[in-house]
């Protein structure tokens, strides 16, 4: 199994039947990987900064506004020039936007296994060239660690403030995104770009 902490350029090509490891992928693929890493870092910096500012100056209920409105808006801002950016999780809060596809789910489950084996959560990532029904796609997934400030909305049920619980029950009646501990994998940033279209 390929190591998920990518210290050097490593591109995986995945099909329904086989997996190929290309240690020195084409320059375009290397560029995609570098650009995806930069986008994931910028996205999390912007989202985390906004969330931290709200948590320091207002009630924790305001953090829900960030996750519901600002996070999707940020993802839309970064989804341009052929790129698609979103957040996904095995325990999603927003069932319309946060549910992983088959590739994302498989890699998220792999992230969890690597986390349980002791690998640093904030270094877990995976890139691949995936053969999908509509063409070949460059895929990138970067784990999102659960930060201490996230626990007021994503922590143990008994530790979540009552006001937050009330809003969550109203806005997300099918919410699964609770019972996390600091350092666990909350989800991932998923970035993709189509390379070619199937004929």
Q: What is each PLM-predicted segment?
A:
Residues 151-158:
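Detector for the c-type heme attachment site
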Residues 23-147, 159-199:
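Extracytoplasmic c-type cytochrome modules immediately beyond a signal peptide or single-pass transmembrane anchor
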Residues 16-18:
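N-terminal signal peptide c-region/cleavage motif recognized by signal peptidases
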Residues 1-9:
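Bacterial N-terminal signal peptides that target proteins for export
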